[in-house]
Amino acid sequence: QTKSAWLQKLSSLDHEDDDPGTVWNKEARDRDKDRMSPRQAWRAIQAGMPEDVIISSDIGNNCAIGNAYPTFEKGRKYLAPGLFGPCGYGFPSILGAKIGCPDTPVIGFAGDGAFGISMNEMSSCAREEWPAISMVIFRNYQWGAEKRNTTLWFDNNFIGTELDPELSYAKVANACGLKGVTVK
């Protein structure tokens, strides 16, 4: 398949289909009709990223989707967590990239589960001498990869995979002296 055909197909997707025998993606779409999907968000972000940006993503379902979207024809760099599953990798890696390349724009991506592991770094990067970064947190209010496994292997019976929908990472960022923004 040519790159052009692949990009056209990718651009036409606006949500995730459920695995056979599960309906929780559909339930989330029906429940939260006013929210954009990760695919819609990734397309919007991709359109606004500088050509020379350093990108980092964490592990998890949201970033697995997003890994298909960034393009690298113009010198962008990508910091990948690899196959070791280092949950919480995205935020610290983008901080390190910005410290190492202070004049280069950086943007990190993580799901809410993975970001929760490293969000304490917000208290460090708010220091006046640290250069600014951008970090995007995708909220699906769950440990998505784990929830997917439990729904597939245990007849849609899951426990301990839901995250608090009332927690605002934007408010946590603001409390750390950073600028936090929520986009739906």
Label the predicted regions.
Residues 1-9, 64-184:
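Thiamine diphosphate
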